[in-house]
Amino acid sequence: MLAHKSLLSFTTQWATLMPSPSTFLASRPRGPAKISAVAAPVRPALKHQNKIHTMPPEKMEIFKSLDGWAKDQILPLLKPVDQCWQPASFLPDPALPFSEFTDQVRELRERTASLPDEYFVVLVGDMITEDALPTYQTMINTLDGVRDETGASESAWASWTRAWTAEENRHGDLLRTYLYLSGRVDMLMVERTVQHLIGSGMDPGTENNPYLGFVYTSFQERATFVSHGNTARLAKSAGDPVLARICGTIAADEKRHENAYVRIVEKLLEIDPNGAVSAVADMMRKKITMPAHLMTDGRDPMLFEHFSAVAQRLEVYTADDYADILEFLVGRWRLEKLEGLTGEGQRAQEFVCGLAQRIRRLQERADERAKKLKKTHEVCFSWIFDKQISV
């Protein structure tokens, strides 16, 4: 069993710096382990709805002027469709004679039989996150200056968003089909969770502001790259090389997409360093909430927290990863080397550049407290037929 690095028992002071329970970091779930069905699922409270359209109108011109740059520097990071992998390449071939097709399905089930239930909790959570893609395209199209104004706009920003969505669409399709064929998960509850999540939307705190939006997507793509890479590692060690290749292939896509969004923020830092570094600080003060933070299966109102706790325990995505991503972005964007900033820009720079170290110190204290408490909880996950998992 992998080491359990808990995010429990924060004081109020610690919580002002650490990711909130609605982030992708795991916090110790509280309350009864057995979740009873309720008539109307309660969506987690929204936190960032009071600010909209916060980018000054004059900065709209920045994104208009960057359309040519985005065409030359961002669109080439997409792959032509005929060079992209497709889910069918990884799955049993239904065009084969029936006996050969069923043999391939049987082999898939034999491979997945060695994977523990807790692994499926994490894999299903990742799949559901990927499957809520309509929400993410909608979110990007709320951003002023870069949205697709017509649904088929030829601007570089709109072209990127549509093609990015098309590439991402393969991820959920592939994982969902693999899970379906494995027989290890309750697809009815998985599908209900997807529908709930898309219906709930997301609340990332980007305020229709592309500065904030592209900081968010930079962090989020890096986080999904890390998560899928770790599920690949676990699948390989548990004896499913095909699933390992699937997760690794998805991780490679996320890395390429991360590079695009990181490159956009780099350009904004070049053109408007004060505005861009302030946007980074703004998003980090809010704490990056990952796309599926409003997840529910209709029964467990803390499903996202419970899923995140399992991901933390399996070291698929941890508090250390959160700090690592922040350090990576600070280095990639060379934030420590920015010069000529205003007072506000300098304060933002100091906050962001020192934040990862502060997070690590607070996490070390939380880990020490968790070791002393030595408490675990059993939680039923509907995705795996109400089996109990320690979190």
From Swiss-Prot:
Example of a GO MF term: stearoyl-[ACP] desaturase activity
Pathway entry: Lipid metabolism; fatty acid metabolism
GO cellular component: chloroplast
UniProt subcellular location: Plastid, Chloroplast
Gene3D superfamilies: Ribonucleotide Reductase, subunit A
Domain of life from the UniProt record: Eukaryota
Coiled coil (residue ranges): none
Tagged with keyword Chloroplast: yes
Reaction catalyzed: octadecanoyl-[ACP] + 2 reduced [2Fe-2S]-[ferredoxin] + O2 + 2 H(+) = (9Z)-octadecenoyl-[ACP] + 2 oxidized [2Fe-2S]-[ferredoxin] + 2 H2O
EC number: 1.14.19.2
SUPFAM superfamilies cross-referenced by the UniProt entry: Ferritin-like
Keywords: Chloroplast, Fatty acid biosynthesis, Fatty acid metabolism, Iron, Lipid biosynthesis, Lipid metabolism, Metal-binding, Oxidoreductase, Plastid, Transit peptide
Cofactor: Fe(2+)
Cofactor binding comment, as recorded: Binds 2 Fe(2+) ions per subunit.
Residues involved in Fe cation 1 binding: 130, 168, 171, 254
Sequence positions that bind Fe cation 2: 168, 221, 254, 257
PROSITE patterns, per the entry: FATTY_ACID_DESATUR_2
GO process terms (BP): cellular response to hypoxia; fatty acid biosynthetic process
Family: Belongs to the fatty acid desaturase type 2 family.
Function: Converts stearoyl-ACP to oleoyl-ACP by introduction of a cis double bond between carbons 9 and 10 of the acyl chain.
Assembly: Homodimer.
Designated name of the protein: Stearoyl-[acyl-carrier-protein] 9-desaturase 6, chloroplastic
Species of provenance: Arabidopsis thaliana
